[in-house]
A protein has these predicted regions:
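Conserved helicase NTPase motor core
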Residues: 5-17, 21-25, 36, 56-57, ...
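Conserved P-loop NTPase-based nucleic-acid remodeling module centered on helicase motor cores
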Residues: 54-151, 276-280, 725-726, 732, ...
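C-terminal accessory regions
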Residues: 462-466, 583, 626-681
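P-loop NTPase Walker
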Residues: 1-110, 116, 219-222, 252, ...
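Conserved RecA-like helicase ATPase core segment
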Residues: 2-7, 42-46, 128, 241-347, ...
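Helicase P-loop NTPase motor core
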Residues: 31-34, 52, 287-291, 297-403, ...
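ATPase/helicase motor core of nucleic-acid motors
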Residues: 284-287, 342, 365, 369-504, ...
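Accessory C-terminal helicase-associated subdomains
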Residues: 181, 200, 372, 470-593, ...
Length: 894
């Protein structure tokens, strides 16, 4: 039966069918890139006979990976092809590299129970060690200008991430004659020492660790190459040096590499990405071997919009020349019935910023009243930053005029009423801190923060306490306890938060129905985020309860230090991957954030911007000597290249109407700047164009399947649907009530035993080695969980593992009640810690099987439990739960 190409055009068909050897797909905006990728994966599986697990697909974001998985599995499901997603290497570079590390953990510097650092965690870890960094030789040569401690931590995080991804020679840098270079080498060396000692891993070191693992262990690399026969990379224009190395290392001599991207949409230089990867991709192969396919037929935008952004890329007004730093291309409309009406306009304010606010409002509301806009989510407002006062004031203006706005990255978290109310109530629960806050009697002065606490948070809380008698009674009781605390409480910050949720208005906030809409759910989502902030602080500072020792210090550190960093840096509000443009709201987002999206109406702001050189003398000096590739573009051209690419990306998000918007201004801060003058000045104002008959497309729903597992979802829902809503749907942080160390320790050590058996190293499964594995696991586990076992408990865990080892070694089976065969059962182990999944039309069911074993055609599924064995004759509730779990796993394995 012939392959179903769907609506693929000739360009797309060529890309889909070119499966062998290197392939470069240049995919312009709206040209069906994801459609082509999905069809290519399906073609490989169904037409070329490639197993799904032989394909690796690296995406730029987790959301893109989820969408790709959903669309691919839907296609395969319709064709009757079953896929175990966990066998496929699909995800971001970071998630794929992390999987490689996990599968071969014993060969890396990373140990079990490592802690992943996000961007804030990384900065905070550096901040906690800042005195160690400052004591390094030549540290002062890096930071010649005085900046605050938190900013220094941020700069160090940026530097080490960049240098790690470029694989610089630290030892060579230490011998350099430039003091700043030596200082940077010392910083990098200390950073690596700390992360190794504390068993930490960040986003950059995930990639370098995976690369080092494959490079230094030929056997592991050969195993990975045996698995992965085809490599595909999305958004290749935004990859960096280490990612390119990983791609070519995995692909090996087969060179079955397909990279997809658009050199005109390369936006992430500030994160270490380089456009050279996509432009120089064909140069890695002998002449003529790399095939290039250009996707240039745009199915997204109206013709006038396409012409507008085509002209933007080619009309550089003699300010610069692209030379060889882009692939020449012309995007053409794919819509057969495109409109001949005006589809690019401007929306201006001529008499100050307030006049501009009025113009934006009038533009939106007139289209709504005319019935052109059916849903506010058809409009998106794009700008360089959603954090500046001008944009935030516009958001607040529109909301005051009853136009809801969705802008989770505008850092408005601390302006939300529910956040102020919760923080105010928390502050008032600590009488010593509250008293000192009134007079700012602290060692360090942070007047803006203290003013926010007093005038906004505490005032909001006092109004609530006055209005709600039950809340007032609770507050008076906790205040009395904290004023004369004699014994430990059974709660910390998170516990107080959850006590508050018993009272109005907080109970009403979290009692909202899921699916009510982003604005209705916002309060519940923000309180959930606050629970994560509190939980993270409690973990990092080991605050499990309040006591006489910490009732004074813990609140001060939390409010004046930890929260200060978040207050100054901002907290992103909740974003739903499955709904990038929530119904009923105008979306405000950065141009970077909008990448890969499309909207019927796009308003582009930030027209006062000009190309700016971003330079860092210290890094530039290191780049010249220690990066493995010389600089690619000329330094003086980079600012123009990046500027033009940024706004090309913005303009090309529009489907039906593109609007350039600003308040016009002359003199300093001229708006629009001269770089937009030629394209802006010729545009008609929206007032001068009849838009009433324009037909807008509706926002396309994002098709992302949700994943569910037995223990994390099904079992939790069966036990308590309210807990499921709270912890899984709203994402609240669970209070740490002491880790189940014993069971985890036994489980992890048995996993070590299984790994040795699967490597055919049964001779290493000795009592001494088992004890060594258990001791190592206990060390990392106790450090990770901040919890400890007594010597007798550790010994008991060891005895459980040894008992299992003896049963497997002498053939009595897993439970010890089988016949003694005298033959080892290690060879019966087929796999351990197996991730399995089952794809359904509406969801994905996942699970992790502890052990799959069998002899001949038999297969046994084993799930280890460290608690007391249930009475099998009485069929207890525990027994029934275990039975259901194994039935689900059996279903997945089948």
């Amino acid at each position: 039966m012939a392959f179903d190409f769907g609506n693929a055009n000739d360009q797309q068909k060529e890309a889909i069918q070119t499966t062998e050897g290197p392939l470069l797909i240049i995919a312009g905006p709206g040209t069906g890139k994801t459609f082509t990728l999905v069809k290519r994966i399906v073609y490989l599986i169904t037409e070329r006979g490639i197993q799904p697990e032989e394909i690796m697909v690296a995406t730029f974001t987790e959301k893109a990976a989820k969408e790709l998985i959903t669309r691919t599995t839907n296609e395969l499901y319709k064709m009757g092809v079953q896929v175990n997603l966990n066998e496929m290497y699909v995800g971001t570079f970071h998630s794929i590299c992390l999987r490689v590390i996990k599968e071969h953990l014993e060969y890396t510097r990373v140990k079990k129970n490592y802690r992943m650092l996000d961007q804030f965690d990384q900065k905070y870890m550096i901040f906690q060690h800042i005195n160690d960094f400052r004591a390094l030789p030549h540290y002062e040569d890096i930071f010649t200008k005085k900046i605050g401690t938190w900013k220094q931590a941020g700069e160090i995080a940026k530097y080490v991430s960049n240098l790690l991804e470029e694989l610089v020679d630290v030892n060579g840098m230490l011998r350099d004659s430039n003091p700043a270079t030596v200082g940077m080498a010392n910083v990098l060396a200390l950073y690596q020492k700390i992360t190794e000692e504390e068993n930490l891993i960040d986003f950059s070191s995930i990639q370098t660790e995976a690369y080092s693992l494959m490079l230094n262990h030929p056997g592991i690399l050969a195993e990975i190459r045996e698995k992965i026969k085809y490599v595909m990379v999305d958004e290749y224009q935004d990859t960096n040096y280490i990612q390119e190395l990983i791609v070519f290392l995995i692909a090996g001599e087969s060179e079955n590499i397909c990279v997809v991207g658009d050199d005109d949409q390369g936006l992430y230089r500030f994160r270490g990405a380089t456009i050279r990867n996509i432009l120089e991709f064909p140069d890695h192969f002998i002449d003529g071997k790399c095939k290039r396919v250009d996707l240039t037929i745009n199915y997204r935008s109206e013709k006038e919009i396409i012409d507008f952004y085509n002209d933007w890329m080619t009309s550089t007004d003699e300010k610069f020349v692209w030379k060889n730093f882009r692939f020449p291309k012309k995007i053409v409309p794919g819509k057969k019935d495109y409109s001949s009406d005006t589809r690019v306009v401007k929306c201006s304010g001529k008499n100050g910023v307030e006049d501009w606010y009025d113009s934006v409002y009038d533009f939106v509301i007139s289209l709504k009243h005319q019935g052109v806009i059916k849903d506010y989510n058809q409009v998106a407002f794009l700008c360089k930053s959603v954090k500046n006062d001008k944009v935030i004031n516009l958001i607040q203006y529109l909301e005051a005029m009853n136009i809801p706005v969705y802008s989770p990255r505008s850092e408005m978290f601390f302006t939300r009423p529910e956040v102020k109310e919760i923080l105010g109530c928390l502050i008032m629960c600590f009488p010593n801190y509250f008293l000192r806050l009134k007079t700012e009697s602290f060692t360090y002065s942070y007047p803006d923060l203290y003013r926010y606490y007093r005038e906004e948070c505490v005032e909001a809380a006092q109004k609530l306490i006055k209005a709600h008698k039950d809340l007032k009674k609770w507050y008076e009781n906790i205040l009395r306890n904290h004023s004369q605390l004699k014994s430990n409480t059974d709660y910390a910050f998170t516990g107080i938060l959850y006590q508050l949720l018993e009272f109005e208005p907080f109970r009403g906030y979290v009692g909202i129905d899921i699916g009510s809409g982003v604005t209705d759910e916002r309060a519940a989502r923000n309180i959930s985020i606050l629970s994560a902030v509190l939980g993270k602080y409690e973990y990092l500072h080991r605050v499990e309860v309040f006591s006489e020792k910490n009732i004074i210090s813990a609140p001060e550190i939390f409010f004046n230090m930890y929260m200060r960093f978040l207050f100054e840096g901002g907290i992103t509000e909740y974003e739903d991957d499955s709904e990038y443009a929530p119904s009923g709201c105008i979306s405000f987002m950065t141009i970077h954030q909008s990448k890969g999206m499309e909207f019927p109406v796009v308003m582009v702001d930030s027209l006062s911007a000009v190309p700016r050189t971003q330079s860092d003398g210290v890094i530039e000096e290191i780049e010249k000597k220690y990066f493995h590739r010389p600089a690619f573009e000329a330094k003086e051209d980079i600012k123009f290249f990046d500027f033009w690419r940024l706004y090309y990306t913005a303009f090309s998000r529009a489907q039906n109407l593109l609007v350039l918007s600003c308040y016009e201004k002359n003199g300093i801060g001229r708006t629009p700047s001269k770089y937009f003058e030629s394209c802006y000045s010729t545009l008609p104002s929206y007032n001068d164009v009849d838009l009433s008959k324009m037909e807008l497309e509706m926002v396309k729903p994002v098709n992302i399947k949700k994943s569910f597992s037995f223990t994390s979802h099904i079992e939790l829902y069966e036990n308590c649907s309210l807990q499921y809503k709270f912890f899984k749907e709203l994402g609240f942080t669970q209070i740490r009530v002491g880790a189940t160390l014993f069971g985890t320790l036994v489980h992890e050590t048995i996993e070590d035993v299984h790994r040795a058996a699967m490597r055919h190293e049964e001779s290493t499964i000795t009592p001494d080695n088992v004890r060594a594995w258990l001791d190592t696991n206990y060390l990392t586990l106790s450090k990770s969980e901040h919890s400890y076992l007594g010597v007798k408990q550790v010994d008991a865990a060891y005895r459980q593992v040894i008992a299992y080892v003896e049963r497997m070694s002498n053939g009595t089976g897993l439970t010890g009640d089988g016949a003694v065969t005298g033959e080892s059962l290690w060879s019966h182990i087929q796999d351990a810690e197996v991730d399995v999944s089952l794809v359904k039309p509406e969801y994905i069911l996942k699970g992790t099987v502890d052990l799959i074993r069998g002899d001949g055609n038999t297969v046994e599924i084993v799930d280890f439990k460290s608690e007391k064995r249930p009475d099998l004759t009485e069929r207890s509730e525990d027994f029934e739960r275990y039975k259901r779990q194994l039935e689900v796993y059996a279903h997945l394995v089948e």
